[in-house]
Amino acid sequence: MTLIAIFLAVLLDWLIGDPYSWPHPVKWMGSYIYLCMRLQEKKQFSPYLFGFFLWLTTVGLALGVSCGLLWLAGLAHPVLYWLVWIYLAYASLAAKSLAFEAQKVYHTLKFGTLEEARKQVGMIVGRETSQLTPEEISKATIETVAENTSDGVIGPLLCLFLGGPILAMTYKAINTLDSMVGYKTEKYRKIGLISAKMDDLANLIPARLTWLFLILSSQILLLDVKGALRIGWRDRYQHASPNSAFSEAVVAGALGIQLGGPHVYHGELIEKPTIGEDSRPVEADDIQTAISLLYTSTMTGLILFTLFYLVMQAYF
């Protein structure tokens, strides 16, 4: 039943994504983190201690609520248990919502104004976007799709196979903390330290699996697989995070473009190394290719994880 539940969760994610009006665990996590940060602004606790408290309570709540919901559902009826299981699993995946948001940036670049495109990309990236050029908007979108292929899809999918929705929701809490407070700016450097470090740890394996799946997907989509391999290997550590460049490097190599470089976060210029080679301008159409890589790597991961799961079930 576990395999069927995972496949149904992936199917639901691909079909409906995350409608804005629907309740969603990650939204609740984000609201809790936001409220805690408002409290910190008023009370000015020790930033390191508050950062630890924020991480511990957010992850603890995600773990505890997931366990509690499944336990209560199991007490009520086995069918309800699996319905809750599938919902939590579906909510942990973000392929459709990621592709949908990237598509909105693409359509705004192609058919809207530059100001609209800047606002649209600002919905999915943490950097300041008010001065971005069309090429920089395309780069930012591709970087987000590439990085979140690991954080938003392959990582949760791996967790579902290893520990079900409880592990997947715990993983999502760790990711959400990093995305909200894990910055190196003056405001977040101390508060977000533990969130950033724990996110690095949680994504060590998913990032490297995503690297492999993206290379395989580059071959399936008849992209530059040699470039994906070469740049993917050469530039896999060209990032402050030990994980983020793994997926970005493969995508940059497969598309023959350059990503990365300095960005402005919360009013501060943060220097970042470049990834890939500046062989041609980055275009809006490259966003579509990045989305194709997202979906293909998701299917590749699902197939390979399933095969591994079946082998483990047969022999252990």
UniProtKB/Swiss-Prot annotation:
Q: Name one GO molecular function term.
A: threonine-phosphate decarboxylase activity
Keywords (alphabetical) are: Cell membrane, Cobalamin biosynthesis, Membrane, Transmembrane, Transmembrane helix
Listed InterPro entries: Cobalamin_biosynth_CobD/CbiB
Q: The organism sits in which domain of life?
A: Bacteria
Can you supply one Gene Ontology CC term for this chain's record?
plasma membrane
Q: Which GO terms describe its biological process?
A: cobalamin biosynthetic process
Pathway given in the UniProt record: Cofactor biosynthesis; adenosylcobalamin biosynthesis
Q: What is its main location?
A: membrane
Q: Where in the cell is it found?
A: Cell membrane
Q: Where are the transmembrane segments?
A: 45-65, 78-100, 151-171, 209-229, 291-311
Query: How does the protein associate with the membrane?
Result: Multi-pass membrane protein
User: What is the role of this chain?
Assistant: Converts cobyric acid to cobinamide by the addition of aminopropanol on the F carboxylic group.
According to its UniProt record, which protein family does this protein belong to?
Belongs to the CobD/CbiB family.
Q: What is this protein called?
A: Cobalamin biosynthesis protein CobD
